[in-house]
């Protein structure tokens, strides 16, 4: 068995993966604001404690870690969402954990999992997007990640969709993820509705479901869908995939957002090549995709 770990901008999830690629046990926690001030210590202490506990229950052969950001070998070169640079997480963990450790970009991990056992397993050419704190992605061709050489590539979240737009944490302006990440949608809803920052995603989802025709909610959701449509259409025009999968916390909102997205792309005629059917599907593995894919 293997241990898969998914590091997000606001959470850590650790799962034990069996030989069929499925999770048999999982532990997770949200990162508190005070923990984010010393993010490296918070990450390492939580991983070390739980890996040691799980090793007592299961025979573990290796560890895979899914991380948002640019990875080179076992080093996190830059993670905007975690706020770290040149962070050799694997090296630090090996001081306490005697197991092979590999680290990959989280969106690529999720894409691998969805293409092997999830929503994209029936397609040879697909694109996978993770919409959460930021936006990540990957291109899958014949069951394999698109080879981008020494650099990670597929940084879809930092595709510019608005000239001189909102400042991104990466330093550029107008990045896709500043407009179309789930964090952007939630923040805009809170601001428009005068809600506190502590208002959780589930509460916002309930508001959209119950009051979808409210003018403020309708406007915010409509603007969000339009920005998301532009980015997704750009990717379709470039790669012409058979299908697109969307994961991250978008999955929880898919019943109120997915059809709007597909209809908007078709109605606005953003696609260069017309399609009879636009296949955009929610991730079948949910937020577990990163955990599972990190071990593939």
Regions found by a protein language model. Give the residues of each.
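Active-site glycine-centered loops adjacent to acidic/histidine catalytic or metal-binding residues
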Residues: 106, 132, 294
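Short loop/edge segments at beta-strand edges and connector loops
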Residues: 103-107, 111
């Amino acid at each position: 068995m293997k241990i898969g770990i998914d590091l997000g901008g606001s959470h850590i999830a650790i799962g034990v993966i069996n030989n069929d690629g499925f999770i048999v046990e999982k532990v997770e926690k949200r990162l508190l604001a005070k923990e984010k001030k010393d993010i490296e210590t918070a990450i390492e202490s939580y991983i070390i404690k739980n890996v040691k506990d799980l090793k007592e229950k299961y025979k573990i052969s290796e560890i895979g870690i899914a991380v948002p950001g640019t990875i080179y070998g076992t080093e996190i070169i830059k993670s905007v969402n975690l706020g770290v640079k040149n962070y050799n997480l694997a090296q630090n963990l090996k001081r306490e954990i005697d197991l092979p450790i590999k680290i990959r970009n989280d969106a690529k991990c999720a894409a691998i999992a969805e293409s092997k056992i999830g929503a994209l397993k029936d397609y040879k050419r697909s694109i996978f997007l993770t919409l959460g704190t930021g936006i990540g992605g990957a291109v899958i061709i014949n069951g394999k990640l698109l080879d981008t050489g020494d650099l990670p590539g597929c940084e879809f979240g930092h595709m510019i969709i608005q000239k001189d737009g909102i400042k991104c944490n990466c330093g550029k302006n107008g990045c896709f993820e500043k407009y179309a990440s789930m964090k952007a949608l939630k923040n805009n809803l809170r601001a428009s509705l005068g809600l506190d920052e502590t208002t959780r995603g589930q509460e916002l989802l309930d508001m959209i479901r119950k009051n979808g025709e409210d003018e403020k909610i309708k406007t915010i959701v409509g603007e969000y869908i339009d920005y998301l449509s532009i980015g997704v259409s750009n990717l379709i025009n470039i790669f012409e995939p058979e299908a697109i999968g969307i994961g991250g916390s978008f999955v929880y909102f898919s019943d109120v957002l997915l059809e709007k997205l597909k209809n908007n792309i078709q109605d606005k005629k953003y696609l260069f090549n017309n399609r009879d059917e636009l296949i955009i599907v929610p991730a079948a593995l949910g937020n577990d995709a990163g955990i599972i894919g990190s071990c593939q």
